[in-house]
């Protein structure tokens, strides 16, 4: 897969020549404007939204992930290591070269301003299921009722095999959780493809230690012992597992679950304090009210209406 670099006023970037935007400057302006989104996926520390990218090969629905660098820590990290968008771009291409799946990377955009945002754009996969919803159902014994079209045991086995291929290829994802795996099934419910997403923490290019492998595996929220056993057996095989590795895995796994529960409790408390002392603000994709708008019309733009 070839890569083409480009520069525009205020921006530099890379793209796939076969899917080059038909009007590069226009599409860059649209990609970087959340108001052009067809759908918002996540609005938090990072922004994720769907746009329709007009390319030389026709329109392509794409997911845009915006990484901000407003704080000093983020700017220093970007200067020393590059942006998280660039990291996602490099890892995505390396995964595909290694025969692993991730939504096709389409565009990398870097603001020339040190404090400006960076954007990673990839193809939107359709007909896929975010594994987090399947695992949530399984953890309460409802996977068959909620997802009758998915062969859950075969999914766990393929998930373990995919994780093994990932690690053997020298990738340490560092956030291998159910929210970062997309599943596509065959007509009979068997897993046809597993896509990895959220790649900006990934380290690559070296052999993983057993400890690093177990730390990655432990982040998958499998609460039923039989599900964990099936997953680990598919990862290690019959000969490589063993009680010591399982014990270390369980210590990491329970530690990860405890950490997540603690974070949720802490966030609940800090959110209450934040709401008391900081005013609510509108999402960034809602523009300012036009100067000529009447008082009645301005209600539409009021931050409390969002």
Enumerate the predicted regions with their spans.
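Membrane-proximal basic amphipathic "stem/tether" segments
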Residues: 2-9, 258-297
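Cationic, histidine-enriched alpha-helical/coil surfaces that engage anionic ligands
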Residues: 3-23, 31-34
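Conserved ATP-binding subdomain of kinase catalytic cores across diverse folds
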Residues: 23-132, 164-169, 173, 268, ...
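Short acidic-glycine loop/turn motifs at beta-strand connectors
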Residues: 55, 185-188
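Hydrophobic residue at the +6 position relative to the catalytic HRD Asp in the kinase catalytic loop
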Residues: 176-186
């Amino acid at each position: 897969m070839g890569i083409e670099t480009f520069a525009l006023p205020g921006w530099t970037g890379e793209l796939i020549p076969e899917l080059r935007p038909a009007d590069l400057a226009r599409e860059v302006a649209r990609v970087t404007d959340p108001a052009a989104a067809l759908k918002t996926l996540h609005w938090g520390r990072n922004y994720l939204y769907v746009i329709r990218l007009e390319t030389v090969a026709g329109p392509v629905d794409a997911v845009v992930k915006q990484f901000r660098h407003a704080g000093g820590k983020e700017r220093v990290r970007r200067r020393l290591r590059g942006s998280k968008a660039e990291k996602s771009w490099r890892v995505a291409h390396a995964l595909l070269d290694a025969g692993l799946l991730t939504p096709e990377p389409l565009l990398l955009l870097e603001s020339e301003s040190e404090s400006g945002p960076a954007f990673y754009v990839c193809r939107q996969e359709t007909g896929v299921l975010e594994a987090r919803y399947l695992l949530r159902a399984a953890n309460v014994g409802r996977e068959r009722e909620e997802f009758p079209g998915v062969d859950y045991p075969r999914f766990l086995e393929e998930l373990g095999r995919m994780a093994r291929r990932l690690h053997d290829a020298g990738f340490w994802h560092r956030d291998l959780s159910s929210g970062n795996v997309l599943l596509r099934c065959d007509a009979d419910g068997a897993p046809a493809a597993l896509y990895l997403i959220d790649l900006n923490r990934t380290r690559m290019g070296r052999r993983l230690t057993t400890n690093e492998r177990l730390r990655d595996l432990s982040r998958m929220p499998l609460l039923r012992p039989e599900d964990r056993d099936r997953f680990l057996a598919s990862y290690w095989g019959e000969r490589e597992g063993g009680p010591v590795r399982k014990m270390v895995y369980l210590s990491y796994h329970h530690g990860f679950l405890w950490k997540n529960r603690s974070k949720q409790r802490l966030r609940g408390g800090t959110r209450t304090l934040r709401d008391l002392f900081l005013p609510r603000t509108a999402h960034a994709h809602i523009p300012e009210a036009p100067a000529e708008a009447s008082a009645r019309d301005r209600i539409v733009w009021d931050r409390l209406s969002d």
